Amino acid sequence: MKTALAALIVGYGLDLLLGDPSFLYHPIRVIGNLIALLEKWLRKVFPKTPNGELAGGVFLVILVCLAGYGVPALLLFAAFKIHPVIGFLLEVLWCWQIPATKCLKDESMKVYQKLKENDLPGARYAVSMIVGRDTENLSETGVTKAAVETIAENTSDGVIAPLLFLALGGPALGLSV
């Protein structure tokens, strides 16, 4: 779409300024629900063998990627047919929702602030909100390492990759991978 770059700039600007629009259901939750539903169905369809599980997994990836691209592409097509401004606003909305820059910054700064205040229990709690491991017994160094590691990983997964795919293929590609 001709407006994709402008929508990316506006949407990413909104992400930097405002963070995720919490008043909306996030597309990643929709995709997660789709995965759970399809996985349940595919476990009934494919045999419970290593090859059956592999085939079901491949089928799941293909279906989710197709739906993740196809549904947004169709919705954008329809929105642009109704009116170009509606299509542009939908593109902006998705370009706002997909990256997680401000959210990542805000959550990581909570860890930094607690460490700065010498509040190790608070820092452990703050880092537990962004990592997938037990933080109860982490030292100050452990909290710092966990925060840096997750910031690096999530910068790749939640900022750089989404921006790359949004730039390459607009919101439809950004939502599909």
Regions found by a protein language model. Name each.
Residues M1-S176:
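Hydrophobic alpha-helical transmembrane segments
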